[in-house]
From Swiss-Prot:
Its EC number is 2.7.4.26. Substrate binds at residues 96, 101, 202. Catalyzes the formation of isopentenyl diphosphate (IPP), the universal five-carbon isoprenoid building block of all natural isoprenoids. Acts in parallel with the mevalonate (MVA) pathway and plays an important role in regulating the formation of both MVA and methylerythritol phosphate (MEP) pathway-derived terpenoid compounds by controlling the ratio of isopentenyl phosphate (IP) and dimethylallyl phosphate (DMAP) to isopentenyl diphosphate (IPP) and dimethylallyl diphosphate (DMAPP). Controls the levels of IP and DMAP that are competitive inhibitors of the farnesyl diphosphate synthase. Keywords: Acetylation, ATP-binding, Cytoplasm, Isoprene biosynthesis, Kinase, Nucleotide-binding, Transferase. One of its GO terms (biological process) is terpenoid biosynthetic process. Disulfide bonds: none annotated. SUPFAM superfamilies: Carbamate kinase-like. It comes from the Eukaryota. This is Isopentenyl phosphate kinase. It is an enzyme of class 2 (transferase). It comes from Arabidopsis thaliana. Its main location: cytoplasm.
């Protein structure tokens, strides 16, 4: 795999955060952002990035018109000589949710075949959709004073070979971090050396970022409390939250809390028909590979007190009994 990454790459990365598409968009409404959740997530990220620093005035960085507004919100007159906030180093990656998946699944982009007009059109349509979402997430975080920079994998030189990452410009990501910005990447339609094209999921992107940037911990923000032994729903009221999953040296994993025999490697996955990225099964698989690197992974419901504690890094030494989520960590 070709990785463009300089020797002076950014070290001391504190956290990589995955914003699950289902948590920040309305899954049953095409291209609809869950504004309330996204606003809370942006606020929680700001608090986590300040790492115990005294709260400072939020200097919004989105100086563009918003839909339904006739004015531009610009805090430039308030900035003056004010000392900038010292944010710890975070990277954000988000999924597509109700953006992109519809276009990709209807056209078969994930299967490849750019010579087909429907696939080529779907490739364009998918990228329009996911880059629109990326812009709105960048704007939401910027309104919280977080210096975000949207970075699309396709435009940054990411490509695949039979769906495995073949090249990635990680040097640009590292330089962006070292310059004091927060990169915001996303799942994207990319070129594939064998298939012609495919979908590169945000979960796969995070694994490669974690491998080369070596964060202290990784947080997956989802629309459920964590990983269950079966999809939680009104028809499955007895679904069990798996609080800790241990990953072995060979990459295999097992549930260690709670100690339920039937959960070991027998988790029942549920994937929506339009989801071209593999759903929870892919998430656990990629999280296990990250944990194998010695990096703890927390899967937790977005916009909750549980997600704030995970983002803050409060769980690294000990996990309170009242914390709800799933921890995936390496176990020798």
């Amino acid at each position: 795999m070709e990785l463009n990454i300089s020797e002076s790459r950014s070290r001391s990365i504190r956290c990589i955060v995955k914003l699950g598409g289902a948590a920040i968009t309305c899954k049953n409404e095409l291209e609809k952002i869950h504004d309330e959740n996204l606003e809370v997530v942006a606020c929680q990220l700001r608090q986590a990035m300040l790492e115990g620093s005294a709260p400072s005035k939020v200097i919004g960085m989105d100086w563009s018109k918003r839909p339904g507004s006739s004015e531009i919100s610009c805090d430039v007159d308030d900035i003056g000589d004010q000392k900038s906030s010292e944010f710890s180093k975070f990277v954000v990656v988000h999924g597509a949710g109700s953006f992109g998946h519809f276009q990709a699944s209807r056209s078969g982009v994930h299967k490849g075949g750019l010579e087909k007009p429907i696939v080529k059109a779907g490739f364009v349509a998918t990228r329009i959709s996911v880059t629109n979402l990326n812009l709105e997430i960048v704007r939401a975080l910027a309104r919280e004073g977080i210096p975000t920079i949207g970075m699309s994998p396709f435009s940054c030189g990411w490509s695949t070979s039979k769906r495995d990452v073949a090249s990635a410009d990680l040097a640009t990501v590292a330089k962006t971090i070292d310059s004091g910005f927060v990169p915001v990447l996303h799942g994207d339609a990319v070129l594939d050396n064998i298939l012609g094209c495919t979908i590169l999921s945000g979960d796969v992107i995070i694994r490669h970022l974690a491998d080369h940037l070596k964060p202290e911990y990784v947080v997956f923000l989802t629309d459920v409390l964590g990983v269950y032994d079966r999809p939680p729903s009104p028809s499955e009221p007895d679904a069990v939250l798996l609080k800790e999953i241990a990953v072995g040296e060979d990459g295999s994993w097992k549930v260690v809390n709670p100690l339920l025999e039937h959960t070991d490697k027998k988790v029942d996955y549920s994937v929506a028909a339009h989801d071209t990225t593999g759903g929870m099964e892919t998430k656990i698989s990629e999280a296990a590979m990250i944990a194998k690197l010695g990096v703890d992974v927390y899967i937790v419901k977005a916009a909750t007190t549980h997600s704030q504690r995970a983002l803050n890094g409060d769980l690294r030494d000990s996990v309170p009994e009242d914390w709800l989520g799933t921890i995936i960590r390496f176990s020798k």
